[in-house]
């Protein structure tokens, strides 16, 4: 049985994992024929990988998504060799693949400090060109965040993520009845009858305070950025890391997971999300599930059990809430279907957005018809 969120259609546009931008190198400067002066070259457009930057930052800061290098300085009597135009440097997140409009790969930026030129500036005017400059290189490029998987499993240690991954995919992760079994991302693939494949990553379990880089905090959260959607996995019986830590209910567990993502990078909450309530084979699981669903219908009214500092500012609207048991196989087919549905919906929205962007760019590039009013000369007047 599957409970769907009341919001039937969710906007997917807030988290950005690909971006289409226009880049143009600067035009070169004019040469000076009478003195043989050389114009300055136009500025290049370069991409620089920098931690902390996201594609959403770029989209918000530069809504026009146009980046143009500076124009080269003309040659003059005072400076026969003109200065080069200013380089337009665009900061992007590490882990980016750059392709042209036809999908041909231009390059990659894997780590902070990596840099690549994506548009060359034009040459300044010299004797060989009759001292006339050339225009800079113009192109439309795509920035794609390299994804480690389509789906990332999010949950506290021992929630059953590894067991779940093993049952819904062909992965064989290490499984044991103790926390922190997973210490690095484990990848699996869900195979569908129409040969569609969806990759799923079992990521190291979070702990409270992961955003402070406790446990494997930042390593885990960094991988979460590189997934298309999130699959929250919670134990219906709740979670307790150790005998000296508080015992959290399933509802509190969901809230704490949301909080960790929010405090690390709030836009992660804009990713499409599915909630799998695991271990439904345990005693009294159905009663606890009913209570959890009521709490999720009105989360803000059920946060009194958590201290103020552990209450998230935002909530996630789960596309689907699916009760499952990795041990018995209960609900796994429903979960697999919900994952596919959410992936397909997200792809449809992205295709529509890309088509709309291309139409808008074509509209801007279409030359406008200039209307002129011609006055009839006296000799053409009819008598």
From Swiss-Prot:
One of its GO terms (molecular function) is magnesium ion binding. Its main location: nucleus. Residues 13-148 form the Obg domain. GTP binds at residues 155-162, 202-206, 278-281. It comes from the Eukaryota. Residues 360-383 are annotated as: Disordered. One of its GO terms (biological process) is ribosome biogenesis. The keyword Membrane does not apply. Keywords: GTP-binding, Nucleotide-binding, Nucleus, Ribosome biogenesis. Residues 149-344 form the OBG-type G domain. GO terms for cellular component: mitochondrion; nucleolus. It is found in: Nucleus, Nucleolus. May be involved in the ribosome maturation process. Belongs to the TRAFAC class OBG-HflX-like GTPase superfamily. OBG GTPase family. This is GTP-binding protein 10. It comes from Xenopus laevis.
